[in-house]
């Protein structure tokens, strides 16, 4: 009688645990825009999500601990003139976030430590260079102030945020159609992209050369997403010819055949992959799904091992993924997602069950810290470096806000090109000031109501 051998893995029993109601963000208006990005970005200080807004594009930023019901008059980041499609926190400054929008611009914002008390309309810098909507923004993982944007003009621009200049351009000759996804390698030397022309490319952005390319990694017509994983491999999600969802693992040096190809189900939502290099686990989250699947990647065949699936009743409209330094290591939490419902953002902790509450060194190797390994000039000059690692043994405390230094010469020149008439303020300026006054009045009224209730309580005693 043959006996089935079960592969040993410390992650075999990882389980997902949704947060209690008082630890969720309630009454948020998640964007209805159709676009395959996560719509949510988190770091150890803040949770940000793209929300519905009248008269332009906006997103909400809240301090991570400010859970519960979100006031309808909460101040928003609202400088874009059309819907926001993607947001990304800077990995080297937890107070800086980038946004890409249908208004063809990328904006970089600085959030104060306590969060916003008034609507934020003026970015630190506006990056203009795309001719169609900007659907992807991604920070360089190890070089300071280097930001990538991809637009529906089929162009990828790499920006030096410190100067506001587009320092690298990958034009339509590289991607002849819509770019579905872009991901940096761990050291930032390469990017991998997926495109509507059904090709996945590995590109050296400083040279503008395609170093590897795979035509039709999935036979279906729906969007493919690709991310770098460990040891020179990439993972793709897509659809078969029969519209079955698939996940595949590839060696970038031998793209003829996948190392592993697995069919999952027949749902229609595009799968967004999130890879954790510390544990070699990849999580697949589908927009419109109510589940998160997770797989472990190993260096030996069959390479891609299904671990389990977290399921819930309500479908997800988007998903945020917390960097490792924002997790609770004393609870053996190895990942945390922020699931967007229609009117709620719900944290979901992925946990390894352990009996001891001591620090589990095998679960938490040194991880990427908040300090950049290179300057923008060093990276543009040809240097590469992996992330500077930190230990989580004593926990992680986010540093106080660091000022984002920007040479405003370029941005100021643009603004001077379209000056406002002096003297009487413009109607746009007046309407903004009126809205600020209304928001302040609403805040004062709520504080007064709280004072009245406290006085009644004291008098009753």
Swiss-Prot record:
Single biological process term from Gene Ontology: T cell activation
Any Gene Ontology CC annotation: cell-cell junction
Record's comment on post-translational modification: phosphorylation at Ser-412 by PKC strongly down-regulates the association with actin. Polyubiquitinated by RNF128 with 'Lys-48'-linked chains, leading to proteasomal degradation.
Modified residues (Phosphothreonine): 418
InterPro entries (UniProt xref): Coronin, DUF1899, Trimer_CC, WD40/YVTN_repeat-like_dom_sf, WD40_repeat_CS, WD40_repeat_dom_sf, WD40_rpt
Presence of keyword Cytoplasm: yes
WD repeat feature ranges: 13-63, 73-110, 123-160, 164-204, 207-251, 258-296, 302-349
Name of the protein: Coronin-1A
Organism: Mus musculus
Organism taxonomic ancestry: Eukaryota, Metazoa, Chordata, Craniata, Vertebrata
């Amino acid at each position: 009688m043959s006996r089935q051998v079960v592969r040993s893995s410390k992650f075999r029993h990882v389980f997902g645990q949704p947060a209690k109601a008082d630890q969720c963000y309630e009454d948020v208006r998640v964007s209805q825009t159709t676009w395959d990005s996560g719509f949510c970005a988190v770091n150890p200080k803040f949770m940000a999500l793209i929300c519905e807004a009248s008269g332009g594009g906006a997103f909400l930023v809240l301090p991570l601990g400010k859970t519960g019901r979100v006031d309808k008059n909460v101040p928003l980041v609202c400088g874009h003139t059309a819907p926001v499609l993607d947001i990304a926190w800077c990995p080297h400054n937890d107070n800086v976030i980038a946004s890409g929008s249908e208004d063809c611009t990328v904006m970089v914002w600085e959030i104060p430590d306590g969060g916003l008390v008034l609507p934020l309309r003026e970015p630190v810098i506006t990056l203009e260079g795309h001719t169609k909507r900007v659907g992807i923004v991604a920070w360089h993982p190890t070089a300071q102030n280097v930001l990538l944007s991809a637009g529906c003009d089929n162009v990828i621009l790499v920006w030096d945020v410190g100067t506001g200049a587009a320092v690298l351009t990958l034009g339509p000759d590289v991607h002849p159609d819509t770019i579905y996804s872009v991901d940096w390698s761990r050291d930032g030397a390469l990017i991998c992209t997926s495109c509507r022309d059904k090709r996945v490319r590995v590109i050296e952005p400083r040279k503008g050369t395609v170093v590897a390319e795979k035509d039709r990694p999935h036979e279906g017509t729906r969007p493919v997403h690709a991310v770098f994983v460990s040891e020179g491999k990439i993972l793709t999600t897509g659809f078969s010819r029969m519209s079955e969802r698939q996940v595949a693992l590839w060696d970038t040096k031998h793209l003829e055949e996948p190392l592993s190809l697995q069919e999952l189900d027949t749902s229609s939502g595009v799968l967004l992959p999130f890879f954790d290099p510390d544990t070699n686990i990849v999580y697949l989250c589908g927009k419109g799904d109510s589940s998160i699947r997770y797989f472990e990647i190993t260096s030996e065949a069959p390479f891609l091992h299904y671990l389990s699936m977290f399921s819930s009743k309500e479908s997800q409209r988007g998903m945020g993924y917390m960097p490792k330094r924002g997790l609770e290591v004393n609870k053996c939490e190895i990942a945390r997602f922020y699931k967007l419902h229609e009117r709620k953002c719900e944290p979901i902790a992925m946990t390894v069950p352990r009996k001891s509450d001591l620090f589990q060194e095998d679960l938490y190797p040194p991880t990427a810290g908040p300090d950049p390994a290179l300057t923008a000039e060093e990276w543009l000059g040809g240097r590469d470096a992996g992330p500077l690692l930190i230990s989580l043994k004593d926990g992680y405390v986010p540093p106080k806000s660091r000022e984002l230094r920007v040479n405003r010469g370029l941005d100021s020149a643009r603004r001077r090109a379209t000056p406002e008439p002096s003297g009487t303020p413009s109607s746009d300026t007046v309407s903004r000031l009126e809205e600020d006054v209304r928001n302040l009045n609403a805040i004062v009224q709520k504080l007064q109501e709280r004072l009245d209730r406290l006085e009644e309580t004291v008098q009753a005693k």
